[in-house]
A protein has these predicted regions:
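Active-site-flanking structural segment that lines cofactor/substrate pockets
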Residues: 40-60
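Alpha-helical transmembrane segments of multi-pass small-molecule/ion transporters
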Residues: 1-22, 30-34, 60-211, 216, ...
Length: 320
């Protein structure tokens, strides 16, 4: 079975499709907000604990180059997204900066889907990847908002926006989980491992149904964004993702890890970035940045991007 078919025929992706279809047929299906919030807390903490456990048994020197690469791409990706949106997307400064903030950050669920995909393909990635997810979340948002500020865009409170990013649940739970996992190590985490491991994939499937419902709603707004922006919503993740895969391969990451890292870099945030943008760039149009991140790029990565990054990683590995 091809990588594309293998990726599409999986519980995680099909649950996302179920959510989209349910929205399109106007079903009354919904995931109650308390359950959705509980699932997001569970998933984020589980990722952090798993990453922290891996960090505890990984030599620090092995993580230095990937961490520096992550920070570098956290600066490069929002810059490229900003100029592409300005030149090709023909967006104003505020809207371009808002979109760039989303593409400069990371989608945790795209990371999860990519990690599951490479695991099914028999090429699992490095255990410390969750630490890189946390590291990639913030720099791109800051860089994009700086662009808006330097260009004279009228914004809201910077201080409040940065507080939204730094204290948001994704950073608190990912970062907190990483610290707890690192301090405790695999041995002390053994007691809670069954809870965070056994139910993880099932919880992710329910979470994906809710994301499918949200994406289905945003896909209805896709026409307002225009063909030019919709094409950029597919082009940008491929460029960023390929750059991520190439960089990860060059710093010595495995093919599986490089593919997952490419998916991370090629993703667009829909948790941390929207919170910051709403505060710092209140005049930016959500029809652009939310439709592109959740309605276009997220489904694109699930269906096509992840297997593409796997293919690129395998090709680069065979050449080097």
């Amino acid at each position: 079975m091809s990588l594309l078919a293998e990726n599409l025929i999986s519980p995680v992706v099909l649950c996302f499709v179920l959510g989209i279809v349910s929205r399109w047929i106007k079903s009354d299906l919904s995931v109650p907000e308390p359950i959705y919030q509980g699932l997001s807390i569970y998933l984020l903490l589980a990722i952090g604990l798993k990453g922290g456990s891996a960090i505890a048994s990984t030599p620090l020197a092995e993580m230095v180059a990937p961490a520096l690469l992550t920070l570098a791409l956290g600066v490069i990706t929002p810059v490229s997204a900003f100029f592409l949106m300005r030149r090709l997307g023909r967006l104003g400064v505020e809207d371009a900066a808002a979109v760039a903030a989303h593409y400069g950050s990371v989608s945790v669920v795209t990371y999860l889907a990519a990690a599951e995909a490479v695991k099914r393909a028999g090429m699992p990635g490095e255990g410390y990847l969750p630490a890189l997810v946390a590291l990639l979340e913030v720099p791109g948002i800051i860089v994009a908002l700086l662009f808006a500020s330097k260009a004279g865009a009228s914004g809201g409170g910077w201080k409040k926006a940065m507080h939204e990013v730094a204290t948001g649940k994704s950073i608190v739970l990912l970062g907190g989980g990483l610290i707890i996992g690192t301090l405790c190590g695999p041995a002390k985490l053994a007691d809670v491992q069954p809870f965070f491991a056994t139910a993880f994939k099932g919880a992710l499937c329910i979470f994906m149904i809710e994301l499918g419902l949200a994406a289905g709603k945003r896909l209805r707004d896709a026409g307002r964004a225009g063909t030019r922006l919709l094409l950029l919503g597919c082009f940008i993740p491929v460029v960023h993702g390929a750059l991520g895969v190439a960089g990860a391969t060059l710093v010595g990451m495995s093919p599986g890890g490089s593919a997952v890292f490419g998916a991370m870099v090629g993703s667009a945030s829909y948790i941390a970035a929207p919170a910051a943008v709403r505060v710092a760039l209140p005049r930016a149009n959500p029809a652009f940045y939310l439709t592109l991140s959740l309605g276009i790029t997220f489904p694109f990565n699930l269906a096509i991007g992840i297997p593409l990054y796997q293919k690129i990683a395998n090709l680069l590995q065979s050449w080097l």
